[in-house]
Regions:
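Polytopic transmembrane helical bundles with strong interfacial aromatic enrichment
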Residues: 4-7, 122, 169-170
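Phosphate-handling active-site elements
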Residues: 39-59
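Short, hydrophobic/aliphatic alpha-helical segments
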Residues: 4-22
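Amphipathic alpha-helical coiled-coil segments
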Residues: 67-74, 120, 127, 187-194, ...
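Amphipathic alpha-helical interface segments
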Residues: 81, 85-155
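A structural-propensity feature for long, helix-poor, extended segments
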Residues: 52-88, 190
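Conserved phosphate/anionic-ligand binding catalytic regions in large, soluble enzymes, centered on
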Residues: 18-39, 145-163
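Preference for long, well-ordered alpha-helical segments
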Residues: 130, 145-204, 211
Length: 211
């Protein structure tokens, strides 16, 4: 399979809009999240090693390093999401002419559905951490870069919530109630807290730019 993360922007968009099974919502979520973290990196690169921003020099360097790791992890999840989804797509094509075939398909489906959830789950965890970095940047970034911080937060919220929707669509077909409870218990608090924090960042910056 192609390394989707190395496609041009044009190819990614065209393939997403085609009948191809991937990239889909999960891959798009990972890409949007990666772009959001990249904006944090840009802000930090514009401010490090400059005397006027020396007060937060070490903070900017740390945020730059951390956001770069998150950015690369999200990029890798574009491919992982595609690789995990393709077996599930094949499950839908399995025969169901006999009771044995129905049982075999159902067993395969349950396994593949859980596998398909793993990449969006990681997207949620990573974007949650990235949003917290954006909040720190909001309090320290120069005024001329504050809109980029806000754009990053908005992108990350979109990725966070998109990851959750990709999980929910698969959870609806999973029969393991304990698994469902575990996934929701682990990830829903991150989605809610991360979304609220991203909204706070946006509203604060929007107010600041309108004043």
């Amino acid at each position: 399979m192609d390394n989707i993360s190395q496609w041009s922007c044009e190819k990614f968009v065209n393939e997403t809009s085609s009948k191809a099974p991937v990239p889909g919502g999960g891959g798009v979520a990972a890409l949007v999240g990666s772009v959001g973290t990249a904006l944090a990196g840009m802000v930090c690169n514009l401010t490090t090693n400059k005397n006027e921003y020396k007060e937060y020099e070490e903070d900017f360097k740390r945020i730059l390093s951390d956001s770069k790791v998150l950015q690369e992890n999200l990029l890798s999840l574009i491919n992982r999401d595609a690789e995990n989804f393709l077996p599930l797509a094949q499950c839908y094509k399995m025969k169901t002419d006999t009771a044995e075939e129905i049982a075999k398909k159902e067993e395969a489906m349950q396994t593949c559905l859980k596998t398909a959830i793993s990449a969006p789950a990681e997207i949620i965890k990573i974007t949650y951490e990235a949003i917290k970095l954006q909040e720190e940047l909001r309090t320290k970034a120069p005024a001329l870069t504050i809109s980029d911080v806000g754009c990053g937060a908005v992108c990350l919220k979109a990725a966070l919530q998109s990851g959750w929707l990709n999980i929910l669509i698969n959870l609806k077909l999973i029969k393991d109630e304990e698994y469902i409870k575990s996934i929701k218990g682990e990830l829903l608090p991150l989605v809610e807290e991360g979304s609220n924090l991203a909204d706070k960042i946006y509203e604060n910056i929007n107010s600041q730019l309108n004043s």
